[in-house]
């Protein structure tokens, strides 16, 4: 396999795009490689400008539960496009999508559509602070909630990948109201409550940006109880896990009903769409009813709404979808772990529905400190081997992988075989 055209494209991109990419992890810096420049995707496969094809376990970082260029979703988007790209005015489809989202999630009375996960979490926090009339926020080490200033404190994902605990350009005044607790640690969390005037707590119930690290059930239930004790608004960030791990996101596994929740990725089916929502008494503080301001030129744009609605309709029609995706994820993670064991390579794997992760680590990972103990050099070697064998994995050990509906057992078994070859070559120093 060669990447000559991609190398040339990347060099050209770096002349006019900061870093050559429009989101940092895409640069492949942590795996010491050159990112393939993608020409197209179809089903479970990506095709690059060098005529290589890959089994794609990234799926645009999660949105494409039905894979690339799904015919039904694609046709509906094209039909919507013929009517106009954006109106800046209400449409019936927005109401229909809102109803579909609300019907899947307990405790959700109303939603507001936005264009990105960052907008959703930023707006939810503003709303929660207004409702609680308290300024301080608790977040958790390794949880990533977008790149708004107050949340870039000990975030996972790109910040972890590049070894920076935060970001330059964020004034101390922006982050001084952000308290950071240890994931899956109630004692650490309550200490934060005691330190500040906490108005809200935001958490990924299934963390996907320090690798895949699910919350322990007793921790999430305890967190809900602490929020009630200290009269703080609980925000579940399900931008990644919503409609991915299950139809009801994390609620399938934990049964926790938050005050506010954020969704993204799957609800836009690959187009820019996210939302936040919750109890009516909180949501009604939003302008134009209340005095909490939030707005967006392209919020609820008809193309993204149409794509998301098409995906949700397909999901709800397919009664065995999540069962099949979960089975494939289990087949993959168990196969990878068995292969690594054959070569005495320490590897921890897990999945939550169609989300999966693996760490080159001796022990199970429960928090950010555990994740940071992973062998990132081994990950980089493995990633590069797999890429050149036609398997496209997330290019950071602090990211999550995804199964999509077009994938088959044969694709999974081929991936495991390629992993076996890769481990063999790594051990032999080839």
Swiss-Prot record:
Q: Which cofactor does it need?
A: pyridoxal 5'-phosphate
Q: Which organism is it from?
A: Helicobacter pylori (strain ATCC 700392 / 26695) (Campylobacter pylori)
Q: Which SUPFAM superfamilies match?
A: PLP-dependent transferases
Q: Where found in the cell? A: Cytoplasm
What is the protein's name according to its record? Glutamate-1-semialdehyde 2,1-aminomutase
Key word Isomerase present: yes
Principal location: cytoplasm
Name of the gene this protein is made from: hemL
**Source organism's superkingdom?**
Bacteria
Q: Which reaction does it catalyse?
A: (S)-4-amino-5-oxopentanoate = 5-aminolevulinate
Pathway as given in its UniProt record: Porphyrin-containing compound metabolism; protoporphyrin-IX biosynthesis; 5-aminolevulinate from L-glutamyl-tRNA(Glu): step 2/2
Q: Which EC class, in a word?
A: isomerase
Q: Which GO terms describe its molecular function?
A: glutamate-1-semialdehyde 2,1-aminomutase activity; pyridoxal phosphate binding; transaminase activity
